Design a protein with these regions (language model features):
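Short helix-coil boundary/hinge micro-motifs
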Residues: 1-141, 148-152, 183
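A structural preference for long, well-packed, hydrophobic secondary-structure segments
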Residues: 138-140, 157, 176
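Short, cysteine/histidine-rich loop/knuckle motifs that typically chelate Zn2+
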Residues: 141-146, 163-165
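Cysteine-rich micro-motifs
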Residues: 157-167
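Basic DNA-binding region of bZIP-type proteins
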Residues: 165-182
Length: 183
């Protein structure tokens, strides 16, 4: 599987990594990294949220729906503007559901979600906590017009999302602009 299809787990939170399952979202050729139920299961495994029950095509549709409900709310939060009420309502429907129980083995662990819907609910709750709490101040958006990926940057020093392609394109463009000015 090519690098373009590889999952990204470097955005700073599970819900931000869910946003990254669709690359170059605003470009002419977006990259869907989670096109199948199998890929959704792989992603849920990687974020330790694989449900007990089998994941279905309807669950994949719900995962896409959550991702695309989160994106505009996150971008509005970073831009410091109120999100559209319809977007908030779309996100809100994921917040109902099971509660998380914890157990102790050799470490503190949460019980696996019963269904993919429950897993998506946990992700939605994490996102809402992040978007409404003090950590929202650490959210940044990649300036690349085709990316606009949201990521957490507690250091305040990142200019681009964790995708190396965005930083490379941005640096090359800046270098060419400086070179053109000096000529």
């Amino acid at each position: 599987m090519g690098d373009r299809m590889a999952f990204r787990f470097d955005s700073g939170a599970t819900w931000l990594n869910l946003l990254a399952t669709r690359g170059t979202h605003f470009g002419e050729h977006p990259v869907e990294r989670m096109p199948t139920v199998g890929r959704l299961v792989e992603w849920l495994d990687a974020v330790e949220l694989r449900p007990v029950r089998k994941v279905s095509a309807a669950d994949l549709e719900l995962a896409w729906e959550l991702r695309e409900a989160l994106r505009p709310v996150a971008l509005a939060t970073v831009d410091g503007v109120p999100p559209d009420s319809a977007q908030v309502k779309a996100l809100g429907r994921f917040l109902d559901g099971e509660s998380v129980s914890l157990k102790v083995t050799d470490r503190l662990v949460r019980t696996p979600p019963a269904t993919a819907t429950d897993a998506l609910g946990r992700i939605a709750r994490q996102a809402v906590d992040h978007l409404t709490g003090p950590e929202r101040e650490f959210l940044s958006v990649c300036p690349e017009h085709d990316c606009r990926g949201v990521f957490s940057d507690p250091s305040g020093r990142r200019r681009w999302c964790p995708n190396p392609a965005c930083a490379t394109r941005g640096r090359v463009r800046a270098h060419r602009a400086r070179k053109a000015q000096s000529e």
